[in-house]
A protein has these predicted regions:
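Non-transmembrane, aqueous-exposed alpha-helical and coiled segments at domain scale
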Residues: 1-150
Length: 150
């Protein structure tokens, strides 16, 4: 809440109750082995860092796209907390572990007169099957167009 006040998103700490969606807060750590929420074993050598993010005041079950792009950007800028957690090298792309798996993101940044600018952010997502099945409709309930004769 104090961060939201300092960023000018809210006027005072009490306003945070009605504005939990920003700022997004993420915790980063160096890569380590862990087990995802689906039970899949993620190896430290397969990721550059770990990220856990809060959304609406709760730990997010996976990773929000806005947070993923911010992580990519911060990893590309030398010396940031995210860059250091990812090993400190130049990172045009990073693979990070989150509660439900891994995600690869990237960013192209440039420094001009001491200011960093993002030229490009890269993120790819895969879809998962939400439902699969059959629907059986009795013949007598099948839709037929109304008669259009006057």
């Amino acid at each position: 809440a104090t961060g939201a006040v300092r960023m000018g998103l809210i006027q005072n700490v009490a306003d945070a109750v009605s504005r939990q969606h920003t700022p997004k807060v993420a915790f980063v750590a160096p890569s380590a082995d862990y087990t995802s929420s689906s039970g899949r074993h993620i190896r430290a050598i397969d990721i550059d860092l770990q990220v856990r993010a809060l959304s609406m005041g709760k730990l997010h079950h996976a990773m929000m796209g806005t947070c993923a792009v911010a992580i990519a950007t911060a990893a590309a800028i030398p010396g940031t907390v995210v860059n250091r957690a990812a090993g400190g090298d130049v990172h045009p792309s990073v693979r990070f572990g989150h509660p439900s798996g891994t995600l690869r993101v990237g960013a192209e940044v440039v420094q001009d007169n001491g200011r960093w600018t993002v030229r490009k952010a890269i993120m790819s997502r895969s879809a998962r099957v939400l439902m699969e099945g059959l629907l059986r409709v009795p013949q007598d309930s099948a839709y037929s167009a109304p008669d259009e004769t006057p």
